[in-house]
Design a protein with these regions (language model features):
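N-terminal binding-site loop/beta-alpha segment at the start of enzyme catalytic domains
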Residues: 1-68
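Active-site groove signature of glycoside hydrolases
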Residues: 92-113
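Short, acidic/polar
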Residues: 21-34, 80-95, 142-150
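Active-site beta-loop-alpha junctions enriched in small/polar residues
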Residues: 12-14, 45-47, 73-77, 105-110, ...
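Alpha-helical structural signal in soluble globular domains
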Residues: 33, 37, 56-64, 94, ...
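Structural preference for beta-strand elements that scaffold enzyme active sites
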Residues: 4-8, 40-41, 67-71, 99-104, ...
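Active-site mouth loops of central-metabolism enzymes
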Residues: 13-25, 72-82, 111-116
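Beta/alpha (TIM)-barrel catalytic core signal, keyed to glycine-rich beta->alpha loops juxtaposed to Asp/Glu
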Residues: 108-168
Length: 168
C-alpha cells in the first residue's frame, strides 16, 4: 500500500493565489524542511492556482521524486472519463513523476455549478488510471456517504477526505 508520514504538508498556499500567497523559493525550502523533519507526504491539487502548486512541488522534489508521497486532486470540471485521464497526465507532468500515490476526486462533478457526470463514469477512469500504474490509490474528497457507496460499486476507494475545515 501507499506509505504516508504521520504529518502531511498541505500545499494549497504554494502557488500564490490564495491565503496570502507564498514565495516560490520559500515554498521549496518549506518542502525540504518538512522532509528533513520526517514529513515526506505532500497534499496538493490542480485547483491550487491552476496547477502552480504542483509545479512548485515538482521543482522541490526534482532529482528525488520517489522520496515523497504525493497526494493530488482532480477538479470536478474534469469528471468525464477522457477529461480525468488527461487531468492526471497534466498533474504528473507538473510534478515530474510517473505516478501519484493518491489521486482524489476533489468534489462531486455537480459542485460549483458543474455539469453532473455519472460517478460511475468518473470512477471508471480512476480505476483505469490505477490499472495503468498512474495512481496507486483512489481517493474521494468532499463526497457524501451515498456518493461514496456508488463509487465503491465501481472500484475500491482507498482514501476518504471528509468535507471538514476548521476555518470554514
Amino acid at each position: 500500500g501507499v506509505q504516508v508520514s504521520e504529518m502531511i504538508l498541505g500545499c494549497w498556499v504554494m502557488g500564490g493565489a490564495q491565503w496570502g500567497g507564498a514565495d516560490d523559493n520559500e515554498s521549496i525550502r518549506a518542502i525540504h524542511a518538512a522532509y528533513d523533519a520526517g514529513i515526506n507526504t505532500l497534499d496538493t491539487a490542480e485547483a491550487y492556482n491552476d496547477g502552480y502548486s504542483e509545479s512548485i512541488i515538482g521543482k522541490a522534489i526534482q532529482g528525488h521524486p520517489n522520496y515523497y508521497s504525493i497526494l493530488s486532486k482532480a477538479l470536478n470540471c474534469y469528471s468525464k472519463y477522457d477529461q480525468l485521464k488527461a487531468a492526471c497526465e497534466n498533474s504528473l507532468k507538473r510534478l515530474g513523476r510517473d505516478y501519484l500515490d493518491v489521486y482524489f476526486l476533489h468534489w462531486p462533478s455537480h459542485f460549483y455549478g458543474g455539469k453532473k457526470v455519472p460517478l460511475e463514469e468518473t470512477m471508471a477512469a480512476m480505476s483505469e488510471l490505477k490499472k495503468e500504474g498512474k495512481i496507486r490509490a483512489i481517493g474521494l474528497s468532499n463526497f457524501s456517504v451515498e456518493e461514496f457507496k456508488i463509487a465503491m460499486e465501481v472500484d475500491r476507494v482507498d482514501v476518504y477526505q471528509p468535507p471538514f475545515n476548521i476555518l470554514w
